[in-house]
């Protein structure tokens, strides 16, 4: 029987990031941010066991610190990213200006763990 290949967490994360870029390039900033959020949440879930839903930014940061991520710079970057996701929720017009930067920062943030 043909085994359906299960994607690794990093493949799933990468898929979301690629999709976010496609949406952004097409001017669909709404969906771009949704995909970026999925990418980040998928990564946090698999890397740090942080639930994908119903978790406030503060809870995410707390959980990161509990899980032994003592790198303040990384924690700070994530905090800024999460704040930006929140900001564009309340100010959707900012998505157009922010998606590219957000995309780059999510990619960079996740990449730092490949080395770690």
Predicted regions, residues:
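Solvent-exposed, low-complexity, intrinsically disordered
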Residues: 1-116
């Amino acid at each position: 029987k043909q085994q359906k290949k299960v994607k690794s967490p990093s493949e799933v994360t990468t898929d979301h990031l690629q999709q976010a870029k496609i949406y952004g390039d097409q001017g669909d900033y709404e969906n771009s941010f949704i995909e970026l959020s999925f990418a980040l949440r998928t990564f946090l879930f698999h890397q740090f066991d942080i639930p994908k839903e119903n978790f406030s930014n503060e809870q995410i940061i707390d959980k990161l610190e509990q899980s032994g991520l003592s790198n303040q710079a990384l924690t700070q970057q994530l905090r800024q990213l999460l704040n930006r996701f929140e900001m564009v929720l309340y100010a959707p017009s900012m998505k157009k200006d922010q998606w590219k930067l957000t995309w780059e920062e999510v990619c960079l943030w996740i990449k730092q763990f490949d080395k770690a």
